[in-house]
């Protein structure tokens, strides 16, 4: 039997070598052997060491000993501003890799580690100080962390402050620099039970020193999310505040908030705006609501489901109280949802149902002037428009009444509509023809006109359409392609295709993104996929699944109240009107979205 050939190379490594080497160096230091430099700390105390160890442990010493300065050759180096006990700890760490951080040494050790460039020790001190955060030191700790570029500690301090802002003393908050206060007010994580508390925080800061701070009031008010301040408070306190009444920029912000609450502000048509995003602590969230549709067996659904993108969870809302039928249209007006028309196959409906999100209830409102199916509905300037081939009418929710308008100049079958830049657009094929056109309604003139928008994309039939950030998006029913029209520039464009087709699916805008759900996919299987398009990244991603595969459903987005995310306990400061809305020690009922409107 042949013996195996001897190995030419035997790879070997000793896992304990690094630790053994450290121990050896530490022993040489203790025996004062081969020492080639002495560090002199503040107060004149000497620390003998090895240059190679210091240079390997710290970029500061590496640069010092490798450069052309006098210290590179000196046997004695004086370190200004480094306490001897802190230098002792850092030298011990260089030879052992260990250091004991405590409440007595954490801050001075961090300063020394920052100066002498021991990043691991600096990070350990920051982690220790994070555990020491409390109401008495959080503001100073954030100052300290930012002064020494401790990102982790600075971030932890800010999170602590935002979460406990209602428990901080008034004097602490009033001493904040402007930039810091603006940062807190603009942060989604500012933990207030109601937006009125954020407004009061800004107002109290200005009132603490009016001569110096009044000029900053418009900037502060812009950082408050006035649209989510309750209407009675907006009228009784914000509008009556002299700082607001005498300031045109503040009055514009107030008007914006009132338009939003009266459903006259289309947040989807405008560009992204933080003021239109409620803080999670208030319990309000923008949600996707699905109404009706058909299931796998083509059975009609009367369920109403809502999806909260913050939690990724679905919840049931009040079921539709009647037979939905087919051919109905769904639209959101403010925080309410309207379902118009439809048919049961033999009879057209003129009925209109309103979902009141504040009480989770469906009620019937004034019927349309004409019964219809396969029409389209959109909201423009706080009014609900219903558009069909031969007629157009408009609903005013403040008077619960309908008004007949001029019909389209060129009747279109089964059109899609969307409001954009103050006008209503309709897209579809001319009645009895295959020619696709786009028409525009001018509300100030009660007039329809044909839009000369060049060659339309090759749609087989009217695509689903929504408006986002001043652009009109068109989702094809038989393709994953997505077209975009800019009415201001009169230009067409494409965005990346969806991950799949959604034949019979639904389209909505939520949180500055397009949401497409359900329908039949590329394999003709009924899908439960919900995918979203983010204009900032120009990418589609699957964000969830429907409760069950569904098609021919409607979807819209509204704001709805969920459980507030404010921490319990602690004191706060009183709001105008005598109620301590920052005092979260007592449970409170959730905010009613109807109060906004």
UniProtKB/Swiss-Prot annotation:
GO function terms (MF aspect): ubiquitin-like ligase-substrate adaptor activity
Keywords annotated in UniProt: Cell cycle, Cell division, Cytoplasm, Cytoskeleton, Kelch repeat, Mitosis, Repeat, Ubl conjugation pathway
UniProt feature, compositional bias: Pro residues: 587-597
Pathway: Protein modification; protein ubiquitination
Span of domain BTB: 35-103
InterPro entries recorded: BACK (IPR011705), BTB-kelch_protein (IPR017096), BTB/POZ_dom (IPR000210), BTB/POZ_KLHL21 (IPR030577), Kelch-typ_b-propeller (IPR015915), Kelch_1 (IPR006652), KLHL21_BACK (IPR047069), SKP1/BTB/POZ_sf (IPR011333)
Kelch repeat copies, ranges: 287-335, 336-382, 384-422, 424-463, 464-512, 513-560
UniProt-annotated stretches for the region Disordered: 570-597
BACK domain: residues covered: 138-239
Record-level GO cellular component terms: Cul3-RING ubiquitin ligase complex; cytoplasm; polar microtubule
Main location group: cytoplasm
Top-rank taxon, per record: Eukaryota
GO biological process assignments: cell division; chromosome passenger complex localization to spindle midzone; proteasome-mediated ubiquitin-dependent protein catabolic process; protein ubiquitination; regulation of cytokinesis
Subcellular location: Cytoplasm, Cytoskeleton, Spindle
Record Gene3D superfamilies: 1.25.40.420, Kelch-type beta propeller (2.120.10.80), Potassium Channel Kv1.1, Chain A (3.30.710.10)
Role description: Substrate-specific adapter of a BCR (BTB-CUL3-RBX1) E3 ubiquitin-protein ligase complex required for efficient chromosome alignment and cytokinesis. The BCR(KLHL21) E3 ubiquitin ligase complex regulates localization of the chromosomal passenger complex (CPC) from chromosomes to the spindle midzone in anaphase and mediates the ubiquitination of AURKB. Ubiquitination of AURKB by BCR(KLHL21) E3 ubiquitin ligase complex may not lead to its degradation by the proteasome.
Subunit structure as annotated in this protein's UniProt entry: Component of the BCR(KLHL21) E3 ubiquitin ligase complex, at least composed of CUL3, KLHL21 and RBX1.
Stated name of the protein: Kelch-like protein 21
Originating species: Bos taurus (Bovine)
Gene: KLHL21
